[in-house]
Amino acid sequence: IYEKEGYCGTCHQENGLGLPDSGFPPLADTNWVNGDHKRLIKLTLKGLMGPIEVKGRNYPGLVPMTPFESLLDDYDAAAVLTFIRNSFGNKSEPVFPWQVNQVRNEIKEKSGFYSPAELLTTHPN
């Protein structure tokens, strides 16, 4: 899933280091990946748009992160998030399909992208 054309690896790269000069942040060793699993699930399902700071570097967020809500079922979302949370030097707890389903139901009425600021307000860690 990670390496499928147009999915995670396209912007964040095979090595998880992203393309900083093009505005795509890394997934390696960042609290956005290793922090609150609910925050990660939300941004994966609904997408992300707006300025974001990752590992001390500011990214303008002009190109939004694709919302995968209609592209990934609960099992595939959990699988790719667990992969990301345990690759590129990351070592975090897995994400389970029931957790994705729970968050999916909680946010089903939300329309549009999340902003980093919005997610940090509800999930600071």
Regions found by a protein language model. Give the residues of each.
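Sequence/structural segment immediately N-terminal to covalent heme-attachment motifs in c-type
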Residues: 1-21, 33-46
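Flexible coil segments in periplasmic/lumen-exposed cytochrome c-class electron-transfer proteins
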Residues: 55, 59-125
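Short acidic (Asp/Glu) and glycine-rich catalytic loops that position anionic groups and cofactors
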Residues: 19-25, 61-62
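Secondary-structure transition/capping residues
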Residues: 9, 22, 34, 38, ...
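Electron-transfer interface patches adjacent to heme c in soluble/periplasmic c-type cytochromes
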Residues: 26-42, 50-54, 63-78
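Structured segments of extracytoplasmic/periplasmic soluble domains
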Residues: 5, 14, 30, 43-47, ...
